[in-house]
């Protein structure tokens, strides 16, 4: 699916830019350009949300109230309507979307809004074998104030597949990117973990990548068959706060996490 895999970058006052996959992170990681840090503070706030193609009312007010103070907003099922693009470009320096499939008017897929321009951007797609619909993922990298580089992986995992072969296949190129990155990592999104084999595959992947799971005390995450679908994983950072916002603005509840880029937990 590589020929159909690209990201669209939206920046205020500029035409949308198409970005193709750059190739192996291993060959590029040592030569990334310098950039402005994602945050000048000692914390990084993120919002993670499957926005349900903005089909319900109040989605924009949720983003305005909870997203505008975040350094990163990781959306899944984000449809590039004029309202969403306007919000993104008015409040963030960059918005990168990977079109998973093109709807009649506006493409839908994962979209990462960021308070700094990424110094690396790698779009990924995987097709669901049953419905033939694609799901997308996006890997971006941002400088931190301490000169480290933060890798951010925004994931919407394949949903309809028999067994976990295709599910695990989607994680492989993500793992290749993470494995060649020595700095901190945030991997988050809708992982469609509605079965035990899927949960096991995701947890196994997280262990292999040395990623820890963010825990939510009042866990109001969307569930299917009793299992949560949305996750935030991380390494090389500390978790200061983590909460779930209960809303009717989507069929998923947004996850709010604050990290500090200081010395990570042992």
From Swiss-Prot:
It is found in: Cytoplasm. One of its GO terms (molecular function) is catalytic activity. Keywords: Cytoplasm. InterPro entries: Endo/exonu/phosph_ase_sf (IPR036691), Endo/exonuclease/phosphatase (IPR005135), UPF0294 (IPR022958). Disulfide bonds: none annotated. Belongs to the UPF0294 family. This is UPF0294 protein YafD.
